Swiss-Prot record:
This is F-box/WD repeat-containing protein 15. The lineage of its organism: Eukaryota, Metazoa, Chordata, Craniata, Vertebrata. Induction: Up-regulated in response to bacterial lipopolysaccharides (LPS). It comes from Mus musculus (Mouse). PROSITE patterns: FBOX. InterPro entries: F-box-like_dom_sf (IPR036047), F-box_dom (IPR001810), F-box_SCF_Substrate_Recog (IPR052121), WD40/YVTN_repeat-like_dom_sf (IPR015943), WD40_repeat_dom_sf (IPR036322). Pfam families: F-box-like.
């Protein structure tokens, strides 16, 4: 017998379901199908998974409903999971194009139902030029004129297909990677140390940290200076933004400097905030930071302390509280655990959206919950793990042989599933190492450096079409 409920209570019940359960509910009868296919429900799921989902996103993707957008985007994300090693083509960029110092994806998306879109990587080389490389065709698609000063920092904003560079003279340039000349230019008086370009709810911005401990916020696309704030007594090591860019953590790896988490809007809305709003996380000698994917307010830090040394993992929830006209930020420690370095010495880590910490030692890949319960171990001896790349979908383990293992986070469990291994086609140089690894939906890149500081960029391009 079919169950009949008024629309509002039924919609309330359906709003608690995940996508898989909504699809099942839609099969009950015609009325349930109509409610379970509601744009309100599917837009909520899209916003939870991909954050900035609005009507512009829907029009850009050419979809009629949020349900169709969700299903197609999931299909796109899982292209690498469905693939096998034989479905990838190994490519290497010619060394005649120059020696590479940086490589960042500038393409916004990969696969579509209609076929295979381009993966495009933006690079800086030793000739002080910026260029873009079509990963699938292995060709240079754009190149800037040679710059008057060496470029020391590069970042990209794939959503807008732009790149931002900073040279040794602290000149900032914004590029659309189509025109030969930069779209906008600005300068700082002090040397730059860190660079980030992000989308916020107030619009796209560039964040730059200098050696004096200042953070400078510039507007995109004209590089107008929005604000400059001194946040630390020394230059900070990195700029770590939360998934929706509500928060930004700034810190320096120093025993007497504690990490600070700032409310991003307090940097951007200078007329509304007389000073930045922040909180201090009371742990020193942090080594790495990772914001929990698809959760705006949770961050995990790995630090070291004591003798014999231990590695600490601490997870905080960051909250904004209002008292009248005053707003304050609080960081609440919700979980922690430690590992003895003489037994397990993690070097790198990441976090899944289900609060699972994955970390790598030289010889193993380990999974813990945020309280320290070990969930799984993947052994790598006699190989050595040299890089670990973690995002909401993938975990990529890179070994000293140049081979890489691709894992996928399970949708309905806490564990990882190993998908396949990709091999490099030529041996690494005797003293070569993998400087950087990154991926998008349809490709994986590696920046390899040898003993002479010569670099090459290799890629694995997925050649599966719909």
């Amino acid at each position: 017998m079919a169950i009949h409920l008024p629309c509002l209570p039924m919609m309330k019940i359906l709003s608690y379901l995940d996508a898989y359960s909504l699809l099942q509910a839609a099969q009950v009868n015609k009325d349930w199908n109509e409610l379970a296919s509601s744009d309100v429900l599917w837009r909520k799921l899209c916003q939870k998974r991909w954050l900035y989902c609005d009507m512009d996103t829907l029009q850009l993707q050419g979809k009629e409903t949020w349900k169709q957008f969700f299903i197609d985007r999931i299909w796109q994300e899982r292209a690498k999971f469905r693939a096998k090693a034989k479905d990838f083509t190994y490519k290497e960029i010619p060394l005649m194009c120059g020696l590479f110092g940086y490589a960042c994806y500038i393409s916004g998306c990969g696969l579509t139902r209609k076929g295979q879109d381009k993966s495009v990587v933006c690079m800086v080389n030793s000739k002080n030029t910026i260029s873009t490389w079509d990963v699938h065709k292995s060709v240079i698609t754009w190149k800037s004129p040679e710059q008057p000063a060496s470029i020391k920092l590069l970042t990209t904003l794939p959503e807008m297909h732009i790149a931002v560079t900073v040279d040794i003279q602290s000149t900032i340039k914004l590029w659309d990677c189509h025109n030969r000349e930069a779209l906008a230019t600005n300068n700082l008086k002090s040397p730059c140390k860190s660079l980030k370009a992000v989308f916020t709810k107030d619009g796209p911005i560039v964040l730059i940290g200098d050696t004096l401990g200042n953070i400078h916020i510039f507007r995109i696309p004209d590089l107008y200076l929005i604000s400059t704030v001194n946040v630390l007594p020394y230059g900070f090591d990195g700029i770590y933004c939360s998934p929706q860019k509500k928060w930004v953590l700034l810190s320096k790896k120093h025993p007497h400097i504690l990490p600070k988490v700032f409310y991003m809007s307090s940097f951007l809305r200078t007329s509304e905030f007389s000073a930045p709003v922040s909180t201090v996380l009371k742990l020193s000698l942090y080594e790495r930071v990772f914001w929990t994917p698809r959760r705006e307010d949770r961050i995990t830090l790995m630090s070291r302390s004591g003798f014999p040394q231990v590695k600490m993992f601490e997870t905080y929830d960051i909250k904004l509280e209002e008292f009248g006209n005053k707003r304050i930020v609080k960081g609440k420690l919700i979980a922690s655990f430690e590992l003895q370095c003489h037994k397990v010495n993690p070097q790198r880590f990441g976090v899944s959206d289900k609060n699972v910490i994955v970390c790598s030692t030289e010889s193993s890949l380990l999974l813990f919950d945020i309280n320290g319960l070990r969930l799984k171990t993947f052994q790598y001896c006699p190989e050595m793990i040299v890089k670990l790349s973690v995002d909401p979908l993938h975990v990529i383990v890179i070994c000293n042989t140049g081979s890489m293992d691709v894992y996928a986070w399970e949708e309905r469990s806490l564990l990882l599933r190993k998908c396949y291994r990709l091999h490099i086609e030529r041996p690494l140089p005797l003293y070569g190492f993998i400087y950087k690894a990154a991926c998008d939906d349809v490709s994986i890149i590696q920046l390899i450096t040898d003993e002479l500081s010569l670099s090459s960029l290799t890629s694995y391009a997925l050649n599966i079409c719909s």
